[in-house]
Amino acid sequence: MASSFARDGSPSRGRSTSPRPRIPEESLEASLMDGLPDTRQLQAFGRKVTATAGSLIGTEGVGQHYQNALGELHRELRRPMLQRSVFSFAQTTPREIVRSRISVPEIQQRALAYVPDDMLANIPEDNNEFSLFQGFQATLPDEPETIKKKGKTHNARGQRLIGGELEDDEYSKLPPSMQRLQKQKHSMSHQLEMMGVRKHMCVAEIHEIDNKIANLNTMRKMVLDRLAGLEIQEEELAQDLLGVDNEIEDLQEELDDAAALAPPKEDSRPTTSGSEAVSETFMSESIYQKISPKSKNRGKKPIRRPSMRVLHEHLESGSKIKELPAHNDSITAMDFDAPWGTLVTASLDDTVRVWDLNAGRCIGMLEGHLSSVRCLQVEESIVATGSMDATIRLWDLSRAEYAPQDNRVNKRGGEGEGEGDGDAQEDEDGLAFENSSDAPPAPPPTIMQDVPLFTLESHVDEITAIHFKGDTLVSGSADKTLRQWDLVKGRCVQTLDVLWAAAQATATNNASSEWRPTGRSMDASADFVGAIQVFDAALACGTADGMVRLWDLRSGQVHRSLVGHTGPVTALQFDDVHLVTGSADRSIRIWDLRTGSIYDAYAYDNPVTSMMFDSRRIVSAAGESVVKVYDKTDGRHWNCGPGVGADEDDNTSHAMIERVRIKDGYLVEGRRDGTVGVWSC
């Protein structure tokens, strides 16, 4: 029989029919020893790595980056998974590594399925009792009954779901009624479990939303602080611009004066005999030198406001902005032109003060009335004041010499007055009167010397209410008359007798000879004319008999009378649709001007002394240390002012609020002790 081995000793590829020879035990042990890892190859590989590392980090080439690299390599080699992979690699011979054939999909699967130990170590510990699959199931909507029935029919005809056969086998041994109950129990248990998962998800969403709200509130506070800083910088820049304008005007005046004092050129004089004859008829040159040149009546320009200040609109409602100790006695009237603008206050201490709401300081005083001012109005830079001396005075605040930043209050005063008294003026005209004395400091007397315009004198008793719009001003007096004034000509153009109008209304409404009053009897302690407002030819007037009369100034007749108040009307204001009135009967009434009926009404515990509204809120002073605020949008009543949070029985901690004014959510209130408070409403 031919040998089954080739000449080179390799087994023949042909199949042999002879039995295989028995392998001796020595050769079997030798083959097993060949399967063990070859340590000599590993030792040689280790020596090569050691030599390479020694050449790289020798004493002559040691660097920080090499040490960092070796440190990172040492940390990587200490990982258990890397050590296991090295040991598994050591157990295989190079032949097996070379001969091993790994498919491309298997390599991709290993690359995608391998997760590093760092990533596994960073997995957060979760105490959630529900799995991810349960959370996914909870997000699925509940199927209607019809879909379930269709699904059952389809599953019965088609391929059953995984686990469906086991459930059917389990329920098949039970009676039909028990099967139905068991399936119903299983379904309800599953729904109950899903409800628990959904509740947990809702709680997690609530916590997440709370965290977002907290972060948003923090961001809002940061942006609000940045907005406040921008508005302060904007105001400072506007004041700097005003100072530069004043310096330019001063320099221009100096240049004009220098040009006027310079000797004229000979060529510039006319040489005609006619001009010489005319010049001889005039005064000599020495007379002209004695006459002082006419000073230019140059008023102070108003501060430029590139944009309206909106900080108060983003503050929390009821936030205190500032407080000014304005007067020594009760506030009788006040008004301001715009938020952070100019405020004018009047008091029983017979003073009228002008305030810069942005800086919180007194600009000056309006002097001229012989008695206390009972009413006033501010419209842009024009101020109208009505006094107990039966006169009405108008003022133009744009003529005031006021520089809020550098205290240069009078540019036309002497140098000694401006320089020597600078510190004294700064102390007198300082901020918020932080001294211990109760008396407010008097501002410089020359600051308002060009402010008065003219005086209206026609009433014979004290002025209790005024209002002007455009060129028309209407005043109400204790002499029981209303007077219409033309501000262009400065004279009275019409007188309206309130008593005559009341008598005419009584005679018209009385069908028989018996007298029936249209309102209540007059209150002797209240003002006969409590409040008025004019717009074009329409005039609204509230009097002490509780009546609100709507006049037509073109005919001088009462167009409509609104009956409802049982006490003197103390405040009123109207817009395009509604008229709001406040009365001593403790009520606030909102009237519909189209129908003359009451649209809404509410009352307080004390008489209403002052009231005003803007686009959203109605604010009132009702004999308390807080301002009563009514939100027209949601119908909510709330309090704003110094008395918020104080005990109801403690009325001595804060003074009673007498007057309120509001514009665009910027609230100013005046108290009985002379203090003025500014709030965000």
UniProtKB/Swiss-Prot annotation:
Residue runs in coiled coils? 211-263
Q: Give any single GO term for biological process.
A: peroxisome fission
Species source reads: Phaeosphaeria nodorum (strain SN15 / ATCC MYA-4574 / FGSC 10173) (Glume blotch fungus)
Which intervals carry biased composition (Low complexity)? 11-20
Ranges of Polar residues compositional bias? Answer: 270-279
SUPFAM superfamilies (UniProt xref): WD40 repeat-like
Q: Which UniProt keywords apply?
A: Coiled coil, Membrane, Mitochondrion, Mitochondrion outer membrane, Repeat, WD repeat
The record gives the membrane topology as:
Peripheral membrane protein
Which coarse location class applies to the principal site listed for this UniProt protein?
A: mitochondrion
Annotated compartments: Mitochondrion outer membrane
Q: Where is the composition biased (Acidic residues)?
A: 416-431
Q: Where are the WD repeats?
A: 326-367, 369-405, 458-497, 505-561, 564-603, 605-640, 647-681
Provide one Gene Ontology cellular component: mitochondrial outer membrane
Please name the PROSITE patterns in this protein's record. Answer: WD_REPEATS_1, WD_REPEATS_2, WD_REPEATS_REGION
Q: List the disulfide bonds.
A: none
Write out the ranges of the annotated region (Disordered): 1-25, 146-171, 259-279, 406-449
- Which family does the similarity line name? Belongs to the WD repeat MDV1/CAF4 family.
Q: Give me the gene this protein comes from.
A: MDV1
Per the entry, what this protein does is: Involved in mitochondrial fission. Acts as an adapter protein required to form mitochondrial fission complexes. Formation of these complexes is required to promote constriction and fission of the mitochondrial compartment at a late step in mitochondrial division.
User: Can you say what this protein is called?
Assistant: Mitochondrial division protein 1
Q: Which InterPro entries match?
A: G-protein_beta_WD-40_rep, WD40/YVTN_repeat-like_dom_sf, WD40_repeat_CS, WD40_repeat_dom_sf, WD40_rpt
Q: Which residues form the signal peptide?
A: none
